[in-house]
Amino acid sequence: MKVKPSVKKICGVCKVIRRNGRVAVLCSNPRHKQRQG
């Protein structure tokens, strides 16, 4: 899980979701997991 000031989709499978007021990117590729922090 990467923590970044701005998150964006890296590939077509990535999904942007809101979790507890935080924006996160989930993907089948674990390297693409990001959270805004």
From Swiss-Prot:
One of its GO terms (cellular component) is cytoplasm. The keyword Ribonucleoprotein applies. Pfam families: Ribosomal_L36. It comes from the Bacteria. Keywords: Ribonucleoprotein, Ribosomal protein. PROSITE patterns: RIBOSOMAL_L36 (PS00828). GO terms for molecular function: structural constituent of ribosome. One of its GO terms (biological process) is translation. InterPro entries: Ribosomal_bL36 (IPR000473), Ribosomal_bL36_sp (IPR035977). Belongs to the bacterial ribosomal protein bL36 family. This is Large ribosomal subunit protein bL36. The gene is rpmJ.
